[in-house]
Amino acid sequence: VVKSSYSLFSCVCWIGALALTARATELDDQFRTPPQNVTRVCVSLTVRRGAAETEWLERQLERARDIGAGGVLLSVPMTVDEAVWQGLERALERSRQLGLDVGLCDFCVAKEDADKVPRARKLVWSQETVQAVSSNTVETPPQVFTPPPSYRSVAHLAAPDGASDLQPHQLIDLSDTALPTNGAWRVFRFGSVELEPQRIDPFSETALFRHVNQWLFATQKRFARTYGSTLLWVHFSGHSQTEYAWPPDMPEAFLKRSGLNLFRHLPVLAGVPVGGGSTAAFVRQHAARTLRELWRDRCGKTVNELVHEAGLEAAIRIDEVPVEPVEVGRYFRRPILIASAKEEVRDSNRLAAGGARTLGRRFVMGWLAPFETEPSPAAVLLPFPWKHAVDRLLADGATRILLDVGGALSSDEAAFKQLRDGCLYAHRCQVMLQQGAPAGDLLVWSEKSLSSLAAYSYDAVNGTMLADASVREGRIRFASEREYAGLAVAAASLRHADDERMVRTLASRGVRVWLMAEDDASESTTVARFSGTANCVVLPANMRELPGLKPDCVWQSDAPGMQVRFMHRRTAAHEVYYLLNENAEPGSVTCTFRDTGKGAPERWDPTTGEIELLETDVRRDPDGRVTAKIFLGAHDACFVVFDR
């Protein structure tokens, strides 16, 4: 009997050890030696005319595999012929053999259909001063710009030069009236031109629907062997933020929304305050809202209904849409963040990633041109010069890096080594950042990231997204199965009565709401209206901790200039914190972690794959939080992992 009991005990221990080993293999070993799957980096390649028919593309795919990439985004000309289709079919088959997943850039057009597809257009304008010299002639400066062939006139207007308070009735429409000959005039020419490179118009609803549907049918038919298994996504190019999108029915849509004649106020878009400052602000605001509504109804919904239902995922850069970054993931399941050191760009990144997490999007892409990135002063200390750019994207919320290598992978060995080292580093990070689910229990409605909530792991939302949510047992729930215990609202987001009503409705259904205002009188007045409302707490400016909800990670450091950002994810077996030192100087930082499982923190280094137990200056507080002192080098990043 003793022998039998001992055997049973040994069996139980062996099974337990096996379970631990399996768990280690599941994450520890994956971190040290990352698996060959979708946790790998993507590379963007440009397939120029004639290249798809040669071995060049196959060699590029093999080189992508050799640097450690796991996917490619292939950009092809807008119009394609049979040779290009066949070349893409071979490229997809070769990608399947190499274990690469593929995305295609934009919805290419067959040559025979090229004239049937409307092209995306942008608004352009010019301004010149014209001086009348006689009853029949005017003195004009020489023309220094020739419109391109795609130019279409929108409006030709004149206004008295020097008018300090220009009103709409003072504008003269020169399309059917001659220019007056008394005095000097400012002449405005507004028109639209096609974007370069050419792309399909996202605002032509019927044409866009028909073309995307035809493209999906063609790819399903031609790439039957790889569609949905190797070909997984499509990237859609929009208007950049320096291009003013011009839908064909923009004036009519603007009139319907605002009640104003856009032609009489077009100079406002060129910076001329027609009607005074408040009217000009009204015009700009409603022009932007008109574009957002048209984009949602035509481009966003079309892509969502067609591409996603056809089994692919759509991607778009968050700086190529007119809607708020936070809601890009509502229509495009792979929002693309943009690598930048500028805080306003990174703020948009964080909002877009927060919205994508709310919507349950697995892949948040991070667009990075490694050889165009300006290296930091600490670059000589880094394993590859653009490491900090990768870390910034990951800290902003990206879960998969997309490397823009300039269209083709170079044969230069130094560049190859850089890319290989960078891919391995990003691969280890992505193994961790695609694990489990975001740990945030807090939802934030704000038009910008709130520095006062920097210690929280939170997801983001706007009013459009909140309208789709439900409430059960005091928790906000989404179709993605993400749910939240509370909502923090910035006063600046509550510009309209409908927004306030939405917040009050959520609070009346048991949702905890924290109202936050900056040092601004109007914002303080807005949040003060919620004082005394059940489940609503009005917070003073710059308060760092929400009553009733502990922060995920609080840090402090004596090192000058130290700035730490973090991400927090949770799996069935681990609490995972990603820490980044934004400073170009090294230093020690003391972090207090809220969710700590068994309380033994480990440091996982993505540069080397090494894992070590943190033992120095580590303490566990009575409330379960763990405080640990961690040394971070210049632009250093690491994971702190707790077993659960």
Predicted regions located by residue number:
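Boundary at the C-terminal end of the N-terminal hydrophobic targeting segment
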Residues: 22-24
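Non-catalytic positions within long, well-ordered alpha-helices that form the structural scaffold/packing
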Residues: 62-66, 394
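N-terminal secretory signal peptides that target proteins for export/translocation
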Residues: 1-6
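Short N-terminal segments immediately surrounding and downstream of signal-peptide cleavage
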Residues: 26-35
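Carbohydrate-binding surfaces of carbohydrate-active enzymes
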Residues: 37-39, 43-44, 51-58, 71-76, ...
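Bacterial N-terminal signal peptides
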Residues: 10-19
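Generic short amphipathic/hydrophobic targeting helices enriched at N-termini
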Residues: 8-11, 631
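Acidic/aromatic-lined carbohydrate-recognition and catalytic surfaces
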Residues: 74-174, 178-192, 197-209
